[in-house]
């Protein structure tokens, strides 16, 4: 059985750890509110933008933008991998890296070259360890922090230029979709060429939920579409970053809450062990006293 001093030191150490996990839980909770507010505020804009873009795509002529045209054969793919810069958030980064690794293996089986654009240190560090993983660009200090739309514009322009120049035939993004405080789902979506945008077959005339507005285009649908397609890429990247940031804070909040609970359980176990050790020490002292008294009598 460990000594009383050893148990006391262990209890003190666990209590210090609990203070840290509790503080990190509170910080993550605070950041989560802000990130979730930004994400939910941006969703209606992204949905309306997709609606207008789909309407324009349906009206556009036969001369289609190169951002919409799939390549005849896919030989090179770029993947935008969104992870966090820091750990201590449970399996958040592990799930994203696992999806990226699975996608990399599928592409290698088809003899497709894969390169990565990184948001976050965890994804970048994983790619550094892979001998067959080419890194294009990296953006650190973005996910989980305060960032503006200009970050998505910078990354989006680089991806669009690479796609138009033939550096890669497709661009995909892997990010964490926020589905609730206890559920963050890693997903992969195609950015380029821009996949077909679903629109309602026929606009409803009653103005209900399925109502699709008739968009009047000036100067022409083709010209407006050419201007909106790059912005659609920026919006998809920005939305992925918002979702990933919110998911990171939610995952860290849950991980630190579980860690604090584990600290409480450990403190209870160590306290019980301390009481047993203390009781054993007191019993031993009493036995010595009684033994000494009996020896004096004898």
From Swiss-Prot:
Compartments reported by the entry: Cell inner membrane
Keyword Transport included in the entry's annotation: yes
An individual GO BP term: proton motive force-driven plasma membrane ATP synthesis
Keywords assigned: ATP synthesis, Cell inner membrane, Cell membrane, CF(1), Hydrogen ion transport, Ion transport, Membrane, Transport
GO cellular component terms given for this protein: plasma membrane; proton-transporting ATP synthase complex
One Gene Ontology molecular-function label: ATP binding
Cysteines engaged in disulfide bonds, as pairs: none
SUPFAM superfamilies tied to this protein: ATP synthase (F1-ATPase), gamma subunit (SSF52943)
Main location: membrane
Annotated membrane topology: Peripheral membrane protein
Alphabetized InterPro entries for the sequence: ATP_synth_F1_ATPase_gsu (IPR035968), ATP_synth_F1_gsu (IPR000131), ATP_synth_F1_gsu_CS (IPR023632)
Quaternary data: F-type ATPases have 2 components, CF(1) - the catalytic core - and CF(0) - the membrane proton channel. CF(1) has five subunits: alpha(3), beta(3), gamma(1), delta(1), epsilon(1). CF(0) has three main subunits: a, b and c.
Family recorded in the similarity comment: Belongs to the ATPase gamma chain family.
Function according to Swiss-Prot or TrEMBL: Produces ATP from ADP in the presence of a proton gradient across the membrane. The gamma chain is believed to be important in regulating ATPase activity and the flow of protons through the CF(0) complex.
Protein name in UniProt: ATP synthase gamma chain
Lineage: Bacteria, Pseudomonadati, Thermodesulfobacteriota, Desulfobacteria, Desulfobacterales
Gene symbol of the encoding locus: atpG
């Amino acid at each position: 059985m460990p000594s009383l001093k050893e148990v006391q030191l262990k209890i003190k150490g666990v209590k210090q750890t609990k203070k840290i996990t509790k503080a990190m839980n509170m910080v993550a909770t605070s950041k989560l509110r802000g990130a979730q507010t930004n994400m939910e505020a941006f969703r209606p804009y992204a949905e309306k933008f997709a609606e207008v873009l789909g309407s324009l795509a349906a009206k556009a002529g036969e001369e289609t933008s190169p951002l919409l045209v799939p390549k005849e054969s896919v030989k090179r793919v770029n993947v935008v991998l969104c992870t966090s810069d820091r750990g201590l958030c449970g399996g958040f980064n592990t799930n994203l890296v696992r999806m990226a690794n699975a996608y990399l293996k599928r592409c290698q089986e088809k003899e497709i070259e894969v390169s990565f654009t990184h948001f976050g240190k965890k994804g970048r560090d994983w790619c550094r360890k892979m001998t067959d993983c080419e890194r294009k660009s990296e953006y650190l200090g973005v996910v989980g922090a305060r960032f503006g739309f200009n970050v998505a514009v910078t990354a989006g322009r680089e991806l669009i230029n690479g796609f138009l120049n033939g550096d890669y035939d497709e661009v995909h993004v892997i990010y964490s979709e926020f589905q609730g405080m206890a559920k963050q789902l890693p997903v992969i979506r195609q950015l380029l060429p821009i996949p077909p945008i679903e629109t309602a077959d026929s606009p409803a005339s009653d103005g209900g939920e399925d109502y699709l507005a008739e968009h009047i285009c000036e100067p022409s649908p083709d010209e407006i579409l050419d201007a909106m397609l790059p912005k659609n890429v920026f919006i998809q990247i920005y939305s992925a970053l918002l979702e990933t940031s919110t998911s990171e804070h939610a995952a860290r909040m849950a991980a630190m809450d579980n860690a604090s609970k584990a600290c409480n359980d450990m403190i209870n176990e160590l306290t019980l062990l301390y009481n047993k050790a203390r009781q054993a020490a007191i019993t031993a002292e009493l036995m010595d006293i009684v033994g000494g008294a009996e020896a004096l009598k004898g």
